Amino acid sequence: MQQEMKIVKPNIKQGKRSTVSKYMETNRICLFNEVCCLCDTDIKAEIDEIIWQMTHGSQIVPLKIEDLQYLYEENVIEKRRFCSFADNKDERMESVVREMKKHEPVDKNSYEHVLILIQTSKDHPLMMSELQGLNDVIEGFSPKAEIRWGLGTNVDLWNRLFIMLVCSKK
């Protein structure tokens, strides 16, 4: 899986939080799921990381640090990352959306805030037609959920599409 940055995770004392991480690779999708149930204030470093990724990865349609401060007050944060490896069978957005639907949050309707970061390379920018695929994913969230999204570029992606989805609630 392509990583846009290297991050050193903080040492968190056992019993302070519950984290489930898994890595799954298919022939077209590279998927990294990370579900964090926040139980203590020791999780600040991980929230800092999410905010850094969201704000520094969204240069075209930016997400602002001050707009993401609510994450420090949330009790549950679920972070999922998807990177397409499009081939002739599927378009890159179709392949990511299919995997997002397979691995979507357990109860999408319960989340109050949703952040979506979309990245492509400058040579293979996001097309307006590709954004239509995200509508199916977004429709499953509560109508009351606040949804924010950012768009950026990453030179390492070439023809791939990267999406990071962060869902949270109190």
Region spans (language model):
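Tubulin/FtsZ superfamily GTPase core signature
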Residues: 1-170
